[in-house]
Curated annotation (Swiss-Prot):
The lineage of its organism: Eukaryota, Metazoa, Chordata, Craniata, Vertebrata. One of its GO terms (cellular component) is membrane. The gene is MS4A4E. This is Putative membrane-spanning 4-domains subfamily A member 4E. The chain crosses the membrane at residues 52-72, 76-96. It is a multi-pass membrane protein.
């Protein structure tokens, strides 16, 4: 890319942040990296909105099912109507939050165990088996 500023001409130099035009794979990976960084910056907000929308859709479908079921002639206990339709939609976002926290804890413990094992293998005392 060449730009004109006044009477002088400037051309950006080759560096690690400037993709070179010769290799298409490098440009593609550079662009994908930028898109991934943008997505990961906004991901918690998007996932929170999606969780709330799913819970609201579940609640509205539950209310519709309750209205249809109340107009029928069969007698059912109130628990049948309230169990999933109301509490399911209320607890769904909380359940997803708990799963995400458990994944973070599990990944932390897994990485910690690998680090301990690696440091033991690198720096630990190597004992050889001696015949009795």
């Amino acid at each position: 890319m060449t730009t004109m500023q006044g009477m002088e001409q400037t051309t950006p130099g080759a560096g690690p942040d400037v993709p070179q035009l010769g290799n298409i794979d490098v440009i593609h990976s550079y662009l994908c990296k930028g898109l991934q960084e943008k997505f990961f910056k906004r991901k918690p907000k998007v996932l929170g909105v999606v969780r709330i929308l799913i819970a609201l859709m579940s609640l509205s479908m539950g209310i519709i099912m309750m209205c249809v079921a109340f107009s029928s002639y069969e007698e059912h206990p109130i628990f049948v109507y309230v169990a999933y339709t109301i509490w399911g939609s209320v607890m769904y976002p909380y359940q997803l939050q708990q799963e995400l926290e458990q994944q973070k804890v599990w990944n932390y413990l897994k990485n910690l165990s690998w680090r301990i094992m690696g440091s033991y293998l690198c720096f630990g005392e190597r004992s050889e088996l001696k015949p009795l």
